[in-house]
């Protein structure tokens, strides 16, 4: 189900791409172990750097590592000392030449991994979990490319004895739609009561034919034309609404205009009948 599976793996090869790009035959398991070790090394050594993603690409005698970070200054260090140290550690681990590329993330509020890390840091600093979740949602929804977000926290929330899960959602987050561009992030907050897992899903529109649809930015029903009432005045309909033909000034005026000729005709008919009766009495006085 789309609600249970990792969104990246669910859409792999459809709307998302592989984060490790290389080919191996007999060394496949060794390369997989190396990739896990590289990501673990960067995650533990650069916790405050705000790393959003790590991409690994291998050639015959070289390993290229792309680090997407919101704080490139921490990764580079003063005069590049930190970057040199990271490169040396990676070369020692892989025993190959390492090309290290540090890329800056322009909008960290719209990256799920960075949003989850921000919420986890607030939870570690004893901020109320509901306040941290709502603040993250408000910051993400201000971005023009974000159409919906869901944030979930699981663990001993608020120091409760029994663990539980709570989530907040705003906008659309279609987890089971394969063409939907869903960004997913997971981070664990270390608190005095134990670990609290933070998961974030961010919906950024649909991808059709390799291009993101711009129609997802418009709210539902925005293209539907509005029906306007004609400019001319029209009498209100009577019936279930409780409005009768004479309950308004316009209705009373219309009713009075229609009743005046009818009353005049009735009066003329009465006078004619009275005149005919008087003539009959004059012609037959004895009767």
UniProtKB/Swiss-Prot annotation:
One of its GO terms (biological process) is translation. One of its GO terms (molecular function) is rRNA binding. Binds the lower part of the 30S subunit head. Binds mRNA in the 70S ribosome, positioning it for translation. Coiled coil: none annotated. Belongs to the universal ribosomal protein uS3 family. SUPFAM superfamilies: Prokaryotic type KH domain (KH-domain type II), Ribosomal protein S3 C-terminal domain. It comes from Mycobacterium sp. (strain KMS). This is Small ribosomal subunit protein uS3. Keywords: Ribonucleoprotein, Ribosomal protein, RNA-binding, rRNA-binding. PANTHER family: 30S/40S RIBOSOMAL PROTEIN S3, SMALL RIBOSOMAL SUBUNIT PROTEIN US3C. HAMAP family: Ribosomal_uS3_B. Pfam families: KH_2, Ribosomal_S3_C. Part of the 30S ribosomal subunit. Forms a tight complex with proteins S10 and S14. Residues 238-287 have a biased composition (Low complexity). InterPro entries: KH_dom (IPR004087), KH_dom-like_a/b (IPR015946), KH_dom_type_2 (IPR004044), KH_sf_prok-type (IPR009019), Ribosomal_S3_C_sf (IPR036419), Ribosomal_uS3_bac-typ (IPR005704), Ribosomal_uS3_C (IPR001351), Ribosomal_uS3_CS (IPR018280). GO terms for cellular component: cytosolic small ribosomal subunit. Gene3D superfamilies: 3.30.300.20, Ribosomal protein S3, C-terminal domain. Residues 216-287 are annotated as: Disordered.
